[in-house]
Amino acid sequence: MALSAAIILAAGEGTRMRSNKPKVLHTLAGKTFLNRVMDSVAALDPDTLAVVVHYQAERVAEAARSYNEHVTIVDQDDIPGTGRAVQCAMAQLTQKDDLDGAVLIAASDMPLLDTDTLDQLLAFHEKSGNGATVLTTILDDPTGYGRIIRDSEGNVLRIVEQKDANSSELAVREVNTSVYVFDAKLLAEAIANLKSNNAQGEFYLTDALEAAKANGAVALSPPPTR
């Protein structure tokens, strides 16, 4: 299917790594996390490849540009959250073009994310006729991850972050991988009115799934692998 844009989120500091280096610039087998994700995403041939930066923005932007001169750099402002990162990206990308197609969103700290997985996700999104699709997995220990909450028919109702989850939600082992596909126009509508009324005071991209459902779109994910 036509991939209008791919947005890689690389604005975070990565405080849990306790490093002066941005998390996405740490390396695996000689290549940065960011560059590995860029490789996997670029192989899908999106019309636009964007990288959102904030923490040590120039350093991360230079790493992205030196690796792929065609990348579009998006500066996230001081408003925190993945939802805000995508708001900034969409605002910049739609200044140039009227996006019409799919938009892939991926975190930059997933160096083992491969093109085949992304290709299958896009195919699932298209075949299912989804307005929004999220890649999930099941973990024995889901601590720290956003939990996938489904209805009785298996549709994704919402994603609840660890700090906002109640006891029953914390027991869910299916988690968000932070990889999504949205129809471009739906994404623009879904992120327009995100709120920060959560435990971390951030604009969550995960809330866009609930907004998508409110707009009549179906939010699904491929069947969990375990």
Where are the regions that the model predicts?
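N-terminal nucleotide-binding beta1-loop-alpha1 segment
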Residues: 1-19, 49
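Conserved N-terminal catalytic core of the sugar/cofactor nucleotidyltransferase
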Residues: 2-5, 31-119, 123
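A conserved hydrophobic helix/loop-capping motif in glycosyltransferases and polysaccharide synthases
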Residues: 7-11, 27, 37
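Short aromatic/basic micro-patch
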Residues: 27, 112, 181
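Short, high-confidence coil segments that cap the C-terminus of an alpha-helix
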Residues: 46, 98-100, 129-132, 217
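Conserved donor-nucleotide/metal-binding helix-loop-beta segment in metal-dependent transferases, i.e.
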Residues: 116-143
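Rossmann-like NAD(P)H-binding beta-loop-alpha module
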Residues: 137-168
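Catalytic-core segments of class I nucleotidyltransferases/pyrophosphorylases
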Residues: 156-226
